[in-house]
Amino acid sequence: MNTNIAAFSPDLPVHMTFEEHDWHLLAQYWYPIALARDITDQPTSSMLLDMPLVIYKMNDELVVAKDACPHRGVPLSLGKNDGQGVVCRYHGLRFGNEGKCNRIPAHPQHKISERFHLKTYAAVEKYGLIWCSLTADKDAEPNIPVMPYWNDADYQQLVCPQVDIKCFAGRQLEGFID
């Protein structure tokens, strides 16, 4: 029997290009994942450390979750918000505040198990960006760089456009160090 098979961990990205130790080390920090002006009640996709994310607002609450329906893994970023939550395009499960499942069409009278709630992540809107940490406590103060002049009228605030670099994070980091 082969004992070298890696154990599956639902907290790690399925297609991870990092060593597990490195991923856990990097996941504790806060990263910008989207421009705040692009986030509405409709789901938007993003990627952080190989983890696919869905971002949406529900009653002015920011929700950042793993971009996979807990039922069959379909990306929720392909769904639509019907006013009560983001609806999965496959079987119609709906996710509202805090990523909690609030409808299973096939079983409308059943109590919804916590297994059907989304895996959500700590996120805040600051400096025109959506910031996220994959392992931080949602109630902890976010460790985001301080920009003391952001609200100062004597300074101009710039939010750079998003650039999608088609390579793994290690190569991106090497490019920034040069």
Task: Name every feature range the model reports, one short phrase each.
Residues 1-62, 82, 96-178:
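Rieske [2Fe-2S] iron-sulfur-binding subdomain
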Residues 64-78, 83-96:
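Local cysteine-cluster metal-coordination motifs and their immediate loop/turn environment
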